[in-house]
């Protein structure tokens, strides 16, 4: 009886450990006690207070808040574009808060796609070239072909060879979004990505992003 009970206890413990490992491995991003303060003159303005966040692979979350509530600051922190005043950020089981800018940049380049409401396209590059450049810099095979496939999904097949100045605001934003996900990042951070789009295009972009996450 003792040996059976002991075996049961050991098995239960092993199962519990195994489940915890699975849960930990499936966590893509983790924030622990994140605080962010900006200093303006003699005052410290607190933007984020004790933020805890867990995002699992293939999970979609929305951060809702008033203007100035810190949503964009949160994206900047997660994307490694800014450092927290205190707290820790883990990406794929690696703490990134203590890494150098170059190390964080390397992680971001390969694993994180950021879509800002305000974006920049290279003026003298066509739509295809703007997207393909990201792939070229990361040694993708056939970057032009991949860029065209992606832009086609965004309804821009007829705009492949147009410069940004020849595109509407909504079309420019679609190019910027296509560029952000061209590397097939593990994590997409979107700061009001459809803010400049009409209803029809907003729905199309949202559906594409959700489909991408499921894939």
Region locations from a protein language model:
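The feature captures the beta-strand-to-loop junction immediately N-terminal to the Walker
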Residues: 64-66
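Conserved ABC transporter NBD signature motif
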Residues: 87-95
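Conserved signature/switch motifs of ABC ATPase nucleotide-binding domains
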Residues: 109, 162-165, 183, 214
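Short coil-to-helix segment of the ABC ATPase nucleotide-binding domain corresponding to the Q-loop/switch region
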Residues: 125-133
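Helix-to-loop junction immediately C-terminal to a conserved catalytic motif
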Residues: 79
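Catalytic Walker B motif of ABC-type/P-loop ATPase nucleotide-binding domains
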Residues: 188-191
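Conserved ABC ATPase signature
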Residues: 163-167, 171-173
């Amino acid at each position: 009886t003792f040996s059976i009970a002991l075996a049961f206890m050991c098995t239960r413990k092993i199962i519990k450990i195994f489940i915890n490992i699975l849960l930990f491995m499936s966590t893509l991003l983790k924030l622990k006690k994140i605080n962010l303060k900006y200093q303006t003159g003699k005052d410290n303005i607190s933007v984020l207070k004790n933020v805890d966040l867990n995002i699992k692979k293939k999970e979609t979350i929305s951060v809702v808040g008033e203007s100035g509530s810190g949503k964009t600051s949160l994206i900047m922190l997660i994307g490694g574009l800014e450092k927290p005043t205190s707290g820790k950020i883990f990406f794929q089981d690696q703490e990134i808060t203590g890494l150098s800018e170059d190390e964080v940049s390397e992680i971001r380049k390969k694993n994180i796609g950021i879509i800002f409401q305000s974006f920049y396209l290279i003026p003298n590059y066509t739509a295809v070239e703007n997207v393909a450049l990201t792939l070229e810099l990361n040694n993708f095979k056939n970057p032009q072909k991949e860029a065209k496939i992606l832009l086609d999904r965004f309804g821009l097949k007829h705009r492949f060879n147009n410069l940004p100045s020849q595109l509407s605001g909504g079309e420019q934003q679609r190019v910027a979004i296509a560029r952000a996900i061209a590397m097939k990042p593990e994590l997409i951070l979107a700061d009001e990505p459809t803010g400049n789009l009409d209803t029809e295009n907003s729905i199309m972009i949202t559906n594409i992003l959700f489909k991408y996450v499921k894939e």
